[in-house]
Regions:
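Hydrophobic faces of well-ordered beta-strands that scaffold small-molecule active sites
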Residues: 1-2, 22-24, 56-62, 78-80
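Catalytic cores of alpha/beta
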Residues: 6-16, 52-53, 60-78
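Active-site-proximal loop/turn and secondary-structure-junction residues that shape catalytic pockets
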Residues: 4-6, 28-29, 64-66, 84
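Glycine-rich phosphate-binding active-site loops on the catalytic face of alpha/beta enzymes
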Residues: 23-33, 74-94
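Active-site-adjacent beta->alpha loops and helix N-cap segments on the catalytic face
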Residues: 6-13, 31-48, 67-70, 89-100
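Surface-exposed amphipathic alpha-helices with a cationic face
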Residues: 42-54, 106-114
Length: 114
């Protein structure tokens, strides 16, 4: 994990010692919360990580929503765990098909980054 508060020195160590995947925490917040960092700041951190080792895959997570996801098209991947949990939970409460509702949401999000 690399957080917005991670120093450049520590970032280099994490990238060097990591396997092929690095999780970039987009902001300091609770899961499912709104972004407190700007998309520009998050992308600058992403570019810094990639500049240390371009071969590492970096996924961005924490605060990614349908309104912000389009800003992160250059990322190797995005984590939207809380959004998925909300869709599943709401579908169950409404006695709807969670898989169908999740598929609809994921197609919408995918269309915003491709």
């Amino acid at each position: 994990l690399i957080a917005p508060t991670t120093t450049k020195k520590r970032m280099k160590l994490i990238v060097k010692d990591s396997h092929q995947l690095i999780y970039q925490v987009s902001n300091v917040n609770i899961t499912g919360g709104k972004l407190k960092s700007t998309a520009k700041t998050i992308l600058n951190n992403y570019k810094t990580i990639k500049s240390i080792n371009p071969k590492k895959h970096v996924i961005i997570g924490f605060g990614i929503t349908k309104d912000t996801i389009g800003n992160f098209k250059t990322a190797n991947g995005l984590v939207i765990g809380s959004a998925c949990c909300k869709v599943i939970s709401n579908a169950i409460k409404k006695r709807q098909n969670p898989a169908k509702n999740l598929n609809i949401m994921l197609k919408d999000l995918k269309s915003r980054v491709i």
